[in-house]
Protein backbone atom coordinates (compact mmCIF):
# COMPACT_ATOMS: atom_id res chain seq x y z
CA UNK A 1 0.00 0.00 0.00
CA UNK A 2 1.18 3.51 -0.68
CA UNK A 3 -0.06 6.63 1.06
CA UNK A 4 0.64 10.32 0.99
CA UNK A 5 1.32 11.25 4.59
CA UNK A 6 1.34 14.75 6.04
CA UNK A 7 1.58 16.28 2.58
CA UNK A 8 4.90 14.55 1.97
CA UNK A 9 5.94 12.20 -0.75
CA UNK A 10 4.27 8.85 -0.94
CA UNK A 11 5.28 6.25 1.64
CA UNK A 12 5.21 2.55 0.79
CA UNK A 13 3.75 0.46 3.62
CA UNK A 14 4.34 -3.29 3.71
CA UNK A 15 2.48 -5.49 6.17
CA UNK A 16 3.33 -9.19 6.41
CA UNK A 17 1.43 -11.42 8.81
CA UNK A 18 2.92 -14.90 8.87
CA UNK A 19 0.99 -16.05 11.93
CA UNK A 20 -1.07 -19.14 11.21
CA UNK A 21 -2.53 -19.83 14.63
CA UNK A 22 -5.46 -18.03 16.19
CA UNK A 23 -4.13 -15.63 18.83
CA UNK A 24 -5.94 -13.94 21.67
CA UNK A 25 -4.37 -11.34 23.95
CA UNK A 26 -5.59 -9.64 27.09
CA UNK A 27 -6.73 -6.08 26.46
CA UNK A 28 -3.62 -4.73 28.22
CA UNK A 29 -1.27 -6.85 26.14
CA UNK A 30 -3.12 -6.11 22.90
CA UNK A 31 -3.17 -2.35 23.48
CA UNK A 32 0.52 -2.29 24.44
CA UNK A 33 1.54 -4.23 21.32
CA UNK A 34 -0.63 -1.97 19.15
CA UNK A 35 0.78 1.22 20.69
CA UNK A 36 4.40 0.12 20.24
CA UNK A 37 3.79 -0.66 16.56
CA UNK A 38 1.97 2.66 16.19
CA UNK A 39 4.84 4.59 17.81
CA UNK A 40 7.40 2.86 15.60
CA UNK A 41 5.46 3.84 12.47
CA UNK A 42 4.93 7.37 13.79
CA UNK A 43 8.66 7.80 14.43
CA UNK A 44 9.46 6.56 10.91
CA UNK A 45 7.13 9.16 9.42
CA UNK A 46 7.83 12.06 11.77
CA UNK A 47 11.58 11.85 12.29
CA UNK A 48 13.18 9.47 9.80
CA UNK A 49 11.62 10.76 6.57
CA UNK A 50 11.22 7.13 5.52
CA UNK A 51 9.83 6.29 2.10
CA UNK A 52 9.20 2.65 3.02
CA UNK A 53 7.94 1.15 6.28
CA UNK A 54 7.46 -2.57 6.90
CA UNK A 55 5.68 -4.39 9.70
CA UNK A 56 6.40 -8.12 9.85
CA UNK A 57 4.72 -10.50 12.28
CA UNK A 58 5.93 -14.06 12.76
CA UNK A 59 5.53 -16.73 15.40
CA UNK A 60 7.37 -19.59 17.00
CA UNK A 61 5.87 -22.23 19.27
CA UNK A 62 5.60 -19.89 22.24
CA UNK A 63 6.49 -16.41 20.99
CA UNK A 64 5.17 -13.75 18.67
CA UNK A 65 7.80 -11.65 16.90
CA UNK A 66 7.07 -8.23 15.46
CA UNK A 67 9.47 -6.14 13.43
CA UNK A 68 8.91 -2.54 12.38
CA UNK A 69 11.56 -1.43 9.88
CA UNK A 70 12.09 1.66 7.77
CA UNK A 71 14.54 2.96 5.20
CA UNK A 72 14.74 6.39 6.80
CA UNK A 73 17.57 8.52 8.07
CA UNK A 74 18.28 6.34 11.10
CA UNK A 75 20.19 7.61 14.11
CA UNK A 76 23.21 6.78 16.23
CA UNK A 77 21.60 4.98 19.14
CA UNK A 78 24.64 5.57 21.38
CA UNK A 79 24.69 9.34 20.98
CA UNK A 80 20.98 10.07 20.71
CA UNK A 81 18.98 10.97 23.78
CA UNK A 82 15.98 8.67 23.80
CA UNK A 83 12.76 10.62 23.75
CA UNK A 84 9.45 9.87 25.40
CA UNK A 85 8.29 7.74 22.48
CA UNK A 86 11.16 5.27 22.69
CA UNK A 87 11.03 5.20 26.49
CA UNK A 88 7.28 4.57 26.40
CA UNK A 89 7.81 1.72 23.94
CA UNK A 90 10.24 0.09 26.39
CA UNK A 91 7.82 0.57 29.32
CA UNK A 92 4.93 -0.94 27.38
CA UNK A 93 6.93 -4.01 26.40
CA UNK A 94 8.25 -4.38 29.97
CA UNK A 95 4.64 -4.30 31.18
CA UNK A 96 3.82 -7.40 29.12
CA UNK A 97 7.10 -9.15 29.99
CA UNK A 98 8.33 -8.89 26.43
CA UNK A 99 11.60 -7.84 24.87
CA UNK A 100 12.34 -4.94 22.55
CA UNK A 101 15.50 -4.08 20.66
CA UNK A 102 16.20 -1.10 18.47
CA UNK A 103 18.88 -1.18 15.81
CA UNK A 104 19.60 1.99 13.86
CA UNK A 105 22.42 3.56 11.92
CA UNK A 106 22.72 6.97 10.35
CA UNK A 107 21.37 6.90 6.79
CA UNK A 108 20.57 3.16 7.04
CA UNK A 109 17.15 3.13 8.65
CA UNK A 110 15.84 1.66 11.87
CA UNK A 111 14.62 -1.78 12.90
CA UNK A 112 12.52 -2.29 16.03
CA UNK A 113 12.12 -5.91 17.13
CA UNK A 114 9.52 -6.95 19.67
CA UNK A 115 9.16 -10.43 21.13
CA UNK A 116 6.56 -11.56 23.63
CA UNK A 117 4.84 -14.72 24.77
CA UNK A 118 1.73 -15.55 22.83
CA UNK A 119 -1.47 -16.65 24.47
CA UNK A 120 -3.25 -19.26 22.44
CA UNK A 121 -6.98 -19.60 22.45
CA UNK A 122 -8.84 -22.07 20.30
CA UNK A 123 -11.59 -20.12 18.61
CA UNK A 124 -14.39 -22.00 16.90
Regions of interest found by a model, annotated:
Residues 1-124:
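Coiled-coil dimerization/phosphotransfer module
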